[in-house]
Amino acid sequence: MSNLKDIKRKIKSVQNTQKTTKAMKLVSTAKLKKAEEAARHSRVYALKINEVLSEIAYKINQFKIVGKDDKFFDLKASINKVDIIFVTADKGLCGGFNISTIKTIRNMIEEYKSKKIKVRLRAVGKKGIEFFNFQGVEILESYKGISSAPTYDKAKGVIASAISDFVAGATDKVILVHNGYKNMISQEIRINTIVPVETPSIENVEHSSSLMEIEPENDEKILEELMKKYFEYSMYYALIDSLAAEHSARMQAMDNATNNAKARVKELQLAYNKARQESITTELIEIISGVESMK
């Protein structure tokens, strides 16, 4: 009987877990729809800013334009220090979502170290911060509570110090890494070099839908405002895109957990029925044996 009680207790425990994971899946599904829509709209705007900025970068390099912002487009400058801003979740239970980003960062660190290039980390998200702190890896700046509730103002705060360091010469390159939303069931690592801005090929510029002519006297002012928006929105989009990917990963993880719990309940139910049958058989044998002994 004690065995039957143990199995019954396990069944109830797994069923409770199943209810929890199912509820978490439903919550993640609802949040995903909202985050997915925000990421889709943000991506259109981010891509357009990148397109226009790349054209300006191309013209600066083509016509050898020199100004206070030309440092942002100098791809020939030597790279001795690299700042990597990476985004992970503040929470777990989302499968390999955080691990994928962490593995990418570790590989990048090793690659740059092999080239004698110093790497500085700026971490957004509790899970990434905890991992690298545990590993004893120095983190220049840490931000918690942002990846789970991103806003444009928060994004500005994260990217501002990295760009200031780049302008001051404290770093030679700023890279943004996050696990982005691909579709409902998959995510992909996205690595974006924020500065220096990469220059497109002549063919890409000539076929660009945003090709424009800018008056020389307005170049500096337009470029300054555009650069500011580019930095801020690149960071904001990474946060929004990462959040959508996090929800899709958690939805999938909770769906798998629910299915596993369902299968486990079925196994335990079979074990319970078998144990109960054996218990009844044993009791019948004991009764029959008792009757026989009385004859």
Swiss-Prot record:
GO biological process: what's one of them?
proton motive force-driven plasma membrane ATP synthesis
Note the topology in the membrane: Peripheral membrane protein
Output the SUPFAM superfamilies linked to this UniProt entry.
ATP synthase (F1-ATPase), gamma subunit (SSF52943)
Q: Which GO terms describe its cellular component?
A: plasma membrane; proton-transporting ATP synthase complex
**Where is it predominantly found?**
membrane
Q: Which CDD domains match?
A: F1-ATPase_gamma
Q: Name one Pfam family in it.
A: ATP-synt
GO MF terms listed in the record are: ATP binding; proton-transporting ATP synthase activity, rotational mechanism
The SS bond pairs are none
Keywords of the record: ATP synthesis, Cell inner membrane, Cell membrane, CF(1), Hydrogen ion transport, Ion transport, Membrane, Transport
TM ranges are none
- Report the subcellular localization: Cell inner membrane
Q: Quaternary form?
A: F-type ATPases have 2 components, CF(1) - the catalytic core - and CF(0) - the membrane proton channel. CF(1) has five subunits: alpha(3), beta(3), gamma(1), delta(1), epsilon(1). CF(0) has three main subunits: a, b and c.
**What does the UniProt record say this protein does?**
Produces ATP from ADP in the presence of a proton gradient across the membrane. The gamma chain is believed to be important in regulating ATPase activity and the flow of protons through the CF(0) complex.
User: Which family does the entry's similarity section mention?
Assistant: Belongs to the ATPase gamma chain family.
- Give the HAMAP family listed for this entry: ATP_synth_gamma_bact (MF_00815)
Name recorded for this polypeptide: ATP synthase gamma chain
Whose protein is this, by species? Campylobacter fetus subsp. fetus (strain 82-40)
